[in-house]
Every structure is written in C-alpha cells, then in structure tokens.
Amino acid sequence: MRLLSFLILACMTLTASARKKVPVADELKPGTVISGIVRKSGDMTPLKIACVREMDLNDSVYSRVLTDKEGRFSFELSDTGHVLMVYATGFYGNPEYDLVAMALDKSYYEITLEPYTGQEANPIMESRVREPHGMEHLFANVNGMRYLIDRDSKTALLSSCSSNTGTVFIPQEITYQNEAYTVNGIRNFAFYGSTGLTGVFIPEGIESIGRCSFYGCTGLDNVILPKGIKTIGEAAFSGCTGLKSVLIPETVVSMGRWAFEGCTSLSFAIIPDGVTRIEPGTFVRCSGLTSVRIPESVTSIGRFAFGGCAALGFIHIPDSVRIIEEMAFEGCTSLKTVFIPQGVTGIERGMFRGCSGLTSVSISESVTSIGANAFDGCTGISWIYIPESVNSIGRDAFKGTEWYNKMNDDGLVYVGNVAYEYRGKMPDNTTIILKEGTTGISEWAFRECAGLTSIVIPKSVKNIGDWAFSECRNLTSIEIPEGVTRIGENTFSMCENLSSITLPESLTEIDSHAFLGCSALTSVVLPEGLRSIGQEAFFNCTGLTSVSVPASVEEMGDNPFHGCSGIESIVVDRGNKVFASPRNCNAIINTATKTLVTGCSNTVIPKGVTMIGEGAFISCRNLTSIKIPNGVTKIGQDAFGLCRNLEKVVLPNSVASIGEGAFAECESLASINIPNGVSSIGRSAFAGCEAITSFSIPKGLKTIEENTFFGCYGLTEIKIPDGVKSIGNWAFCECRNLASVIFSGNDIVIAPEAFSNCPGYER
C-alpha cells in the first residue's frame, strides 16, 4: 500500500506523534473526524488560529473550522478524492502562517507552523506539493508575491502577497528562473481579510478572480476589472464594506454566490450581458445599493440575490427571466413597484417579505403559485390583482398587507380563485361547498376546523396545499377530483374520523405524513399512475388492514406505513419494476437493494432478502414471532422497534449488523440468539426488552454501545467475551436485576455510567 508523500516548504513542518504512522490514501474516508492542535515552531504554547481550511488542490472542498483558545481544532472530511491541504490563517486574514500540506487520518496531530515572513526573509524561493498520482504543483515567490506556476502553459495564479496594505499592483507578467509567465488569475483567498488594502490594480490578462479572494477587505473602496475577466468567484468581494463602485466588464459570464455580499457602500451595479444567472446572495445586504441593471441574458435570479438591499427603489426584471427563487428581494424596504414578467411560473416563499414600501405589484398570467410569506409585511400594498392562472397560495402569503387586512368578514376567504382560509370559528357539523371555478385550496386553508364534517370540491380544483385539512378531526369523507396530482405534506394529518377517501387517477405523489394519524381509515385504493409515496405517509393509520401497491410506484420514503399495526395483507402489483411481494410474502421488497421495506404480522420473509430495512416492522403490535432467513446480513435501525408482543426471533448466522433501536421496546421478547458473526450492535438495540433474562454477546463484537440494554429489567446475567474492548455509557443502565457480569478479558474500557442503577453489579 503506497504512502502519500509530499515535498513541503522548509519554512514549515508538520509533526505527528512518534507512535503514529504516516497515513495512507485508503485511510482517508468520508466522515472521518480530524482533530489536532496548532503550536508555533520551537514553542509549546498553543496558538489561537482563525480557521483551518480543508480543501483539495483544486479547491473543490472548503470548510471553515475555528480553533479554541488552546489551538485545538476538529472537522469532518467531506471528500477524500484528492490530496487534502490545510491552511491556517490569523484572525485578520494576514498570512501569519504559511501553507501546510498533509495527509490526515483519525490520528491526533500537532501542526507546527513557522511564521510566514515573505520572500525577503525567506531564502526558499519555491515549494512543491506532489499528488499521489504524480502531478506536481509549483509555488514561487517573486517580488513579494506568491504564485502557483504552470510550466506547461507558462501561466501563473497569484496566490498571496506579503504586503497587503495600501494599493497593490498585480503585474501582467512575471519572470521566474529566466522564464516569462503570464499572470492569468487571482487564486482563492489571495487577499482574504486584508483590511489595510485600499486599492488594487488588476491588469489585462487576468481571466478569473477566485473564491473569497478579497473577502473582508474593508478598506478597499473601488475596483476596476479589466476586459478579459470571465469569472468572479464565490464571495470574491464579500464583506468589502468600503467598496463604492466596481466596474464589471462585458466579458464576465459568471459571478459566484455571495460575490458582493455585505458591500454596504456599493451604490450601483451593472450586470454584464453575458451573465445568465444571478447566483444566490450575489448582492445580499448591499444596503446602499440604489440601482441595478439586469440584462436580457439573465434567465434566473437566485435566493437572497438582493435580500436586504434596503435602498433599492426600483428594479426592472427582464422578460428573459423564468425563475426567481425564494427571498430574492426580501427586505428591500425602498422598493415601490414590481412587474413579474411573462414566463415566471412561481412567486416563491418570502420573495418580497418585508418590502414595506411596495405599493404596486403586477403579476403575469404565467404565474400559477404564490409561496408562503411571499408578500408578508408589505404594508403598502392596498390592492393586488391575482390572475386566474394562480391555483396555489402559501400560508401567510399576504400577511400584514393593507389589501388583505381589509377582508374582515368571517367565513371562507377566496384570494383570486383560490380557497385561501376559513376565518373565525367554524360551526359544528359544517359542510363546505367550494364555488365552481375554484382552482386551488391554499396551505392551512381549513387547518383545525373541528366543525368541518364534509366538503365538496369542484372538478376545477387542481391543487391542494400542505396541511390544508390537518386536524379536521370530524371530517369523515372526501373525494379528490381528477386533475389533482399531489396530496401534500400533512394535508390530512390527524383527521381521526376520516374513514373514506377517493383518490383520482391523475394522482402521482403522496407526500410525507399526508395521512398521519388517520386512524379510522380501513382501506385506501392507490391509483395506477401513482409514482411516489412519501416518508411516513400513512403513519399510525391503525385501522388500515391491507395495502396494495400499483405497478407505477417507483419511489417510497422511509417507513411509509409506520405504525399501521392493523395491516394483515400487503400486495405489490407484479408489473412493478422497483418493488415486489414475491410468493405472497405479505411484504414490500426493494428488488434492487434486496431490502424488505415494509412488513406486517403475516409476513414470511422470502429468500434473497439481504437487509431488513429501517422501521420495516416498527409498532407491528400483532407480530409475535419472526424467522429471518439465511442471507440477511443487516437488521436496520428500528426494524422491529415497539413490537411489544414479539416473543421469538430467529436470526441466521449470516447477520453481521444490528442497527440502532432494532428491537427496542420489544417487551415480550424473552430470548434471542445472536450469531457470533455479528460485529456491530447499534445504540439502544435492545433497550426496554424487559423480558430478556440472559444475553450472549457475540465474539466478534468490539464495542457495546450506549443504551444497548437500557431498561432490560429482567436481565440477570451477562457474559462479556474478550473481544469486547469498550462499553458505552448507560449500556446496562436500569438493569436492576443484573446480578452476574462475567468478563473474559481484562483490557476493556468501561464508561462511568455504563452500569448505572444496577444495584447488583460489582467490578
């Protein structure tokens, strides 16, 4: 196995504990937690560093990690596809310490850094970092500036500067080792946090300005970008509070997210014609911005793009724009008029929230939806035209507007052709008949209307919002008309007396928790054409006795029938290409992953299944015994949790992993055989199994996790094999009758609370 190797600057060193080996590439796994401490070279005093940045040589990974007062840091690897590098910078962004390249594993490291003094004090002219596959990266110091050199293309990227005060002149070309290199870009973080920088001369030939390159340069007051620049990176000028003007050339085709975020002195911006998208947060919190020109080339405006631009009094959105994302203009308190162009289909959540100066809004006929809080707090709007095309309006879309506040009458309120909300207390035994031509029912429209017993929905309705009938506890039946394609999140949740519902053939999606707690439902006919059933869509529908999944269903969220304890029959149409119920097994099997997704009290697990999925049998109150066939290797999280009448489980030798809470609260489970091949038992796996009296820990297990046997009151004896090296907190907590614990080995770490409230335990 080949070790990672690097050639690193002589001006800095990375030291690890002598007992730790140099890590190899295969040890760099996503999710690995890296921890360490930063110290100054030749001094044991810890340093408080502003941040440690994790990134690869292509800068595709970035995370900011603050150290504590003792210089300790910790972060989790998100990508391990490249050599990882760590930058340590001082609190004000100046390069107090130079670049450190290193490989990381789970070991604890000390990073020892030499102060970076620049070229004059440092005789080393270059540094090289070599990737595992042989690619070499050359850094060179020339006239107080540091560059990433590309010998093949004869180009150089400005990486940092030893003097970041006053005006900095970036050369068009540098000479290094008697060869000329064209400076073609400013690298990520080049002038990061240089508060003393007041000006910068950027020559022609520069094509890119990197991510955070001038981040926090609060003294920078104006920037002229030359022709030829194509990209401005993410947060390139973020926090440049003194920046009054920036000239963006027509050659720019891309400006990254948050590019000018917080440039509070910036008064105007002209976006060049080549830009097609204004990225999220591009001008957010530019509180002095009064004028913006958006060209016809722009087709989308990202979330928060102009949020908090309090001085922006007018903005022309060109007809080319098709998408405006949520909160794009939130808090633009000086904005007076807005025209939503033809082609935009949705006014998204919070788009104009808090625009208190807004008095006139023109919405085009292409708009079909208005999101939650879209005009919330727009107190100046006294009238607004809602086109007939709108069939979906989110909660509090017009909250606080003068126009909406004028609607004082109790009863059903329509906004345009949308049944928006029921005001006041609904009388008992109310039947609502929606008027012909109604196109939608808004989010939360009838939520908590306990008096509603029935509703007639016309065929013109095409959309029913999330939570629309949630907690209508006396609603007994409903027919959804053809044309509706989605039952939204929590649409009928806690409709406890809903016993009959007719779903249309047009339905393609049932979202998460759509029928949560509809305990009176005994059957639901899922129409052919339905493609998706969301997470816990039928949670605690205890009256359901059967489930029939049509051939069209291709996606299911986690535990769609969680807590449906009355289900006795499960059938999947034979034409389904994703799910199956082979040999009348009364279960839903994902055929690609060979995972049992949902089971019931009559399930017979078929051969070929390799995993019992998360929550597959959770709260299955009528399940008394289950035999798991050979070939199953994993019991998922909460797989049999809360099966309170489960008495017998047969596990095959093939099982290697038992997930968190897999058998938690199985109160009747008196014994279970755990194969010796099991190497992982998750937290709380057997918590609350009160009837278990003895348990044999498998020889392959190394750790007994937290809460594994919490509250196993009947447990009297436990044998810990010598393979177990640690026992977590509360692993045997509240095992009040535990009288005998036999340890086969001595080298074991026991957490302080592992046996808390076990009066019979002594070690």
Regions found by a protein language model. Give the residues of each.
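Consensus positions within tandem repeat domains that build extended binding/scaffold surfaces
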Residues: 188-189, 210-215, 233-238, 256-259, ...
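Short, ordered, surface-exposed loop/turn motifs in non-cytosolic proteins
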Residues: 32-34, 41-57
